[in-house]
């Protein structure tokens, strides 16, 4: 059984994240979307909120599980018995950062493989930060994020 970990902040989770998770779940037996608990990073949603939003948003993906961690990613990957880290790339601009991260992770844990998924074309142009900005200005993000996230963003920004 191959377990893969898809780590991220997921602040908030987007349809692009879910697309990567769904595609990864067709290849791996289990995909754990692991929310990185970053106490030093300014985030819109708390770790508990991000986990809850992810759980609601992945109910339709039976091979996708949700968890949280606050250690080195490779240490977390090993702790859950996984052998693969899943990452997504939207555009060429993501490649350098992902390449550097992969090199660091492979140096720390040569036994863990990194698998990069290219974003589906409809998800290449936006990120979680884009979603937050649009939502903060009162824009419609329902086509970018799952329903539970739309509702959460409306609560945060107090609109509509």
Curated annotation (Swiss-Prot):
Listed InterPro entries: Cyt_trans-like, PPAT, Rossmann-like_a/b/a_fold
**One cellular component term from this protein's GO annotations in UniProt:** cytoplasm
GO MF annotations for this entry?
Answer: ATP binding; pantetheine-phosphate adenylyltransferase activity
**Record carries keyword Nucleotide-binding:** yes
Q: In which pathway does it act?
A: Cofactor biosynthesis; coenzyme A biosynthesis; CoA from (R)-pantothenate: step 4/5
- According to UniProt, residues marked as the site described as Transition state stabilizer are 17
What are the entry keywords? ATP-binding, Coenzyme A biosynthesis, Cytoplasm, Magnesium, Nucleotide-binding, Nucleotidyltransferase, Transferase
Q: What does this protein do?
A: Reversibly transfers an adenylyl group from ATP to 4'-phosphopantetheine, yielding dephospho-CoA (dPCoA) and pyrophosphate.
Protein name (database record):
Phosphopantetheine adenylyltransferase
Organism listed in the record: Roseiflexus castenholzii (strain DSM 13941 / HLO8)
